[in-house]
């Protein structure tokens, strides 16, 4: 019994190793036989623990020594005992025969993937390693190339100095453009007449409200005028219209005495009378009253000069005919008749009639 404990058999050691490999948690102490000295025997007895299956399997399968000694046949020839302080390292016993344990699948898989990766890496075609661009990338490259070409072209072009002639031309163009803008606003100026009674009123461009200004000027033919300004928006043309509504029909037999009658201010009375009445009288009434006064004075002058009563009767008949034939349409013939005798006075202007109501005209 003592001999079996000192020198265990091969089968017992093999069973112990298999049991320890299956269940590594169980720790079992086993004495080891060292050299002849007793000190080395005590140091060689160590408690052996099984740490991990992998380490145990790697240490279990190793080279086997060939020794004829029965005492050292269980241990390998490469067994070493290193005593360094209290730590003692010794090689584990190696078994004869192949291992029946199954290899791990994880190790095989890792080796397979490593070999495959190396094969793929060696067979990789480096010529195909070209970056592929989609349409967006190509467009971006084209725009970048165009910008670079433009920038290089701008750098190559020398900057031309500003010539004084070009500055003068730009200055003149700016002046003409300002003049064209100012010419859009049309201003109305009154025309000069030979008589002193004319009073024209002109509205400036600063007036923002449309207004009507009336002025009456009585000359030998009792002409009245009216300025009427229409104010439009700021960007449009401003216009002014002058109206001459009231005129008198003068017969062809116009003498110097009759001209004196108009120059004395008799024709102006009818106009003033209409203004005092509030402008309610019509143009026809004013014209008829004016013609009656004119014919009466004309008859009196003919009686004094000639002394024929029959001529007065004829003039009365003519007076009735003139009053009967008088109408608003006859007033428009004044300028045609007056231009024969007084071309200097009325030749510069043409009348414009807006209404037949004297209250609005005068």
UniProtKB/Swiss-Prot annotation:
UniProt record similarity statement: Belongs to the BIG GRAIN 1 (BG1) plant protein family.
UniProt biased composition (Basic and acidic residues): 50-60, 132-144
Keyword hit for Cell membrane: yes
Localisation per UniProt entry: Cell membrane
Function: Involved in auxin transport. Regulator of the auxin signaling pathway.
Organism whose genome encodes this protein: Arabidopsis thaliana
A GO cellular component annotation in the UniProt record: plasma membrane
Protein name: Protein BIG GRAIN 1-like D
Region (Disordered): 22-113, 132-168, 303-327
Extent of Low complexity compositional bias: 63-78
Domain of life: Eukaryota
Alphabetical UniProt keywords: Auxin signaling pathway, Cell membrane, Membrane, Transport
Xref: InterPro entries: BG1-like
Skewed-composition ranges (Acidic residues): 309-324
PANTHER family per the UniProt record, alphabetical: PROTEIN BIG GRAIN 1-LIKE A-RELATED (PTHR33541), PROTEIN BIG GRAIN 1-LIKE D (PTHR33541:SF15)
Regions of compositional bias (Polar residues) in chain numbering: 23-47
GO biological process, one term: circadian rhythm
């Amino acid at each position: 019994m003592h001999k079996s404990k000192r020198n265990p058999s091969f089968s017992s050691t093999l069973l112990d190793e298999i049991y320890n490999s299956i269940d590594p948690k169980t720790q079992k102490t086993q004495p080891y036989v060292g050299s002849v000295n007793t000190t080395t025997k005590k140091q060689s007895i160590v408690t052996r623990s099984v740490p991990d299956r992998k380490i145990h399997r790697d240490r279990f399968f190793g080279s086997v020594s060939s020794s004829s000694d029965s005492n050292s046949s269980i241990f390998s020839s490469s067994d070493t005992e290193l005593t360094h302080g209290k730590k003692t390292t010794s090689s584990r016993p190696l078994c004869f025969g192949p291992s029946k344990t199954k290899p791990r699948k994880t190790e095989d898989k890792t080796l397979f993937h490593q070999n495959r990766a190396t094969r793929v890496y060696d067979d990789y075609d480096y010529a195909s390693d070209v970056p592929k661009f989609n349409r967006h990338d190509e467009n971006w490259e084209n725009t970048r190339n165009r910008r670079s070409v433009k920038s290089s072209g701008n750098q190559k072009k020398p900057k031309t100095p500003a010539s004084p002639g070009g500055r003068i031309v730009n200055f003149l163009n700016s002046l003409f453009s300002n003049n064209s803008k100012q010419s859009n606003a049309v201003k109305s100026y009154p025309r000069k007449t030979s008589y002193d009674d004319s009073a024209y009123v002109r509205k400036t461009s600063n007036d923002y409200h449309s207004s009507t200004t009336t002025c009456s000027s009585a000359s030998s033919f009792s002409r009245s005028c009216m300025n009427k300004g229409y104010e439009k928006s700021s960007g449009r043309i401003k216009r002014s219209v002058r109206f001459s509504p009231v005129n008198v029909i003068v017969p062809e037999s116009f003498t110097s005495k009759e001209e004196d009658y108009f120059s004395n201010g008799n024709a102006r009375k009818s106009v003033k009378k209409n203004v005092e009445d509030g402008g309610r009288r019509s143009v026809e009434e004013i014209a008829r009253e004016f013609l009656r006064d004119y014919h009466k004075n004309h008859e009196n002058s003919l009686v004094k000069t000639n002394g024929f009563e029959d001529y007065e009767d004829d003039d009365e008949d003519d007076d009735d005919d003139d009053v009967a034939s008088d109408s608003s349409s006859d007033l428009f013939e004044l300028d045609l008749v007056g231009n024969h005798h007084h071309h200097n006075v009325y030749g510069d202007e043409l009348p414009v009639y807006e209404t037949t109501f004297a209250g609005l005209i005068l």
